[in-house]
C-alpha cells in the first residue's frame, strides 16, 4: 500500500489509535421512603422540622419520597363532621372527605421543603396513582405506578405523597383504614425498590405497650418478626398487620 503523505493529510494506510472512553456505570443514589405520622406533622413548626430532617437526606445524596399522615386530630374531626352531616353516609363521599387531611399536610410539607431550598412537589394518592380495590374505608393496594415519581427523582425533586389513600376502580378516592399511611409508605418503598423505609414516630423504639398511656411499659431491645406480627395482630400500633 502506498503510504506517501498527501499535503495536509495523515499518511495513507496509517490509523490513529482510538481514544478509550470510560463506560463505568455511575454510582446509584440511595433511595429512601420517609413516613411521618400525625404527631410529627401536628403543626406548622413540626412540619418545618420534618422538612429539615428530609433535607439532610437530600444533602447526603439520596432520592427521597416522603409519606405523610394528616395533622394530629384532623382525621377524627373530619369523621365527626361526616357523621354530623349524615347518619347513613355514602362510603365514597366519606372517603373523599376523610382523605382531605393528608392532602393539606402533603401540600404544607412540600411548601416547607421549597422554603429551605429543596425542590419538592406533593402528590395525592390518585395522582401517583396508588391503585386500590373498591373496598371504601378499608381498601387494599393493588399496584403503584411510580413512573412519574421516578421521573421527578431524575430532576432532583423530593416527592411528598399523601398517605392513607388511593384510587379505586370506579375512579373515586379510597382510604386504606387504620394505619393506612404506614401501609402507603411500605408499599411505595417496595414499588420504588427503595433501599430503606423509615417510619418516624414520637416513641423512641418498640415497647411492650404504649408508653404514653402505661408508665411501666418496657422498651424491647430485640424482637423477632413473628413476635412483631403477633403484637400487630393483637392491636399494637408499632406495625401495620396488612
Predicted region positions:
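Nucleotide/pyrophosphate-binding catalytic subdomain
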Residues: 19-242
Amino acid at each position: 500500500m502506498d503510504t506517501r503523505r498527501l499535503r495536509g493529510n495523515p499518511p495513507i494506510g496509517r490509523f490513529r489509535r482510538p481514544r478509550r472512553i470510560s463506560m463505568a456505570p455511575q454510582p446509584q443514589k440511595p433511595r429512601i421512603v420517609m413516613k411521618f405520622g400525625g404527631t410529627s406533622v401536628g403543626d406548622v413548626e413540626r412540619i418545618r422540622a420534618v422538612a429539615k430532617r428530609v433535607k439532610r437526606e437530600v444533602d447526603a445524596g439520596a432520592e427521597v419520597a416522603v409519606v405523610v399522615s394528616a395533622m394530629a386530630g384532623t382525621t377524627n374531626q373530619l369523621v365527626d363532621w361526616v357523621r354530623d352531616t349524615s347518619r347513613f353516609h355514602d362510603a365514597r363521599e366519606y372517603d373523599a372527605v376523610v382523605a382531605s387531611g393528608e392532602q393539606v399536610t402533603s401540600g404544607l410539607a412540600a411548601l416547607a421543603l421549597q422554603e429551605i431550598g429543596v425542590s419538592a412537589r406533593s402528590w395525592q394518592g390518585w395522582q401517583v396513582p396508588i391503585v386500590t380495590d373498591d373496598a371504601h374505608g378499608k381498601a387494599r393496594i393493588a399496584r403503584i405506578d411510580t413512573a412519574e415519581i421516578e421521573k421527578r427523582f431524575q430532576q432532583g425533586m423530593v416527592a411528598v405523597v399523601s398517605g392513607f389513600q388511593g384510587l379505586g376502580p370506579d375512579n373515586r378516592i379510597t382510604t386504606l383504614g387504620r394505619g393506612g399511611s404506614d401501609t402507603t409508605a411500605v408499599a411505595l418503598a417496595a414499588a420504588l425498590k427503595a433501599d430503606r423505609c423509615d417510619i418516624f414516630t414520637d416513641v423512641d423504639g418498640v415497647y411492650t405497650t404504649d408508653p404514653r398511656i402505661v408508665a411501666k411499659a418496657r422498651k424491647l431491645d430485640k424482637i423477632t418478626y413473628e413476635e412483631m406480627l403477633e403484637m400487630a395482630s393483637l392491636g399494637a400500633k408499632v406495625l401495620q398487620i396488612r
